[in-house]
Amino acid sequence: MLETMRQQDSIHRKAGSVHGCALFCGGDMLMFVEDVGRHNAIDSIAGWMAMHGVSGADKSFYTTGRLTSEMVMKAAQMGVPIIVSRNGVTAMGHELAARLGMTLFGRAANRHFLCYTGAERFDSEPDPQRAAVRVVKA
């Protein structure tokens, strides 16, 4: 996912001042949207999912914006259990994701990221050749 996002051609890379969101199924990016507002970007993906009857159960969601409670709630409404952001996670976003049983990753850059909730979904003995995960305890 992170490698796909790093290679993604984007307005942000060319001009800045926009947020990007993507929907993934495994390692495959299904949709990528950029907008000046992170809420607009996630709403575009939610609308696409609704229009095409796409279930979020086996999907993951990536955003360049902060993971606030609003972003976590929108992902939950989409049925997406795993959320990844290259930025940070707010306390309310973290608490809501934990209550909803979602997996929340923040500060995802290169091959390193923080797992705030839902670490039990992943191998506790990561392959040293793969991404490094640090679990954050509440």
Positions of PLM-derived features:
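Conserved mixed alpha/beta catalytic, RNA-binding, or beta-rich assembly cores of soluble enzyme
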Residues: 1-66, 71-73
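Conserved catalytic-core subdomain
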Residues: 72-138
